[in-house]
Amino acid sequence: MTEPSSRRSGYARLLDRAIRILAMRDHSEQELRRKLVAPVMSKNGPEALDVTPDELEQVVAWCIENRYLDDNRFVGQFIASRSRKGYGPARIRQELSQKGIARQVVDQAMRECDIDWVSLAREQAQRKYGEPLPSAFTEKVKVQRFLLYRGYLMEDIQEIWRNFAD
């Protein structure tokens, strides 16, 4: 027989919530902490959980120890996912920074990922502007602006026109 949630300890409720959150997708440690202390929706509207800092630390430590939470795995999956969606290294780094990932972890993962950013930038430009890519200055500037917005580095963008003669 299960206990009603009001009688369960704060730690047990918090651990249950953490596992449900991490079952959906990987999260960074900072994201998980933020979601665990955020109010939950109940039948009566938003309901704040009574979470002590000690309980939060115990739950996060348990998740890390049992490999439910791993920033390195999260970073690798995040880089792969965002690059498949056409985003460049600068944008991915910035988003990971916002998610609370240490710069060293991001740098290491970016070095280890096997992504050809120049060809990915070219694919994005071709998808948006067609083949062949424009060679007129004003049109080239539009392509460059688009790719910079997507997070590609200027040297990768310039490499498109150097390496791939239309």
Curated annotation (Swiss-Prot):
It holds the Pfam family RecX_HTH1. Belongs to the RecX family. Transmembrane segments: none annotated. It comes from the Bacteria. It is found in: Cytoplasm. Keywords: Cytoplasm. It comes from Klebsiella pneumoniae subsp. pneumoniae (strain ATCC 700721 / MGH 78578). This is Regulatory protein RecX. GO terms for biological process: regulation of DNA repair.
